[in-house]
């Protein structure tokens, strides 16, 4: 995501930097950058492991946010264009 994107400015200006939403945004940004890196370097297994760790951390934060504040969770996944969690 570019540094001047509207999603970035709305999350950084509205919310505290340490809020769950901004953490999820930054993890999503790192995931997109690592995904692009892995498209170029398919055998970079340490980066693949790092990507899986970041995905797990983002998933845990999304679960936390969905339990604590469902409307903010739905708004965030809409802004970031990511899939929601699977409901069991």
UniProtKB/Swiss-Prot annotation:
One record GO biological process: translation
Subcellular location field: Plastid, Chloroplast
Record-level Gene Ontology MF annotations: structural constituent of ribosome
CDD domains membership: S15_NS1_EPRS_RNA-bind
Alphabetically ordered keywords of this record: Chloroplast, Plastid, Ribonucleoprotein, Ribosomal protein
A GO-annotated cellular component: ribosome
Principal location listed in the UniProt entry: plastid
InterPro entries in UniProt: Ribosomal_uS15, Ribosomal_uS15_bac-type, uS15_NS1_RNA-bd_sf
Family listed: Belongs to the universal ribosomal protein uS15 family.
NCBIfam families (alphabetical): S15_bact
Subunit text: Part of the 30S ribosomal subunit.
Protein name: Small ribosomal subunit protein uS15c
Gene name linked to the record: rps15
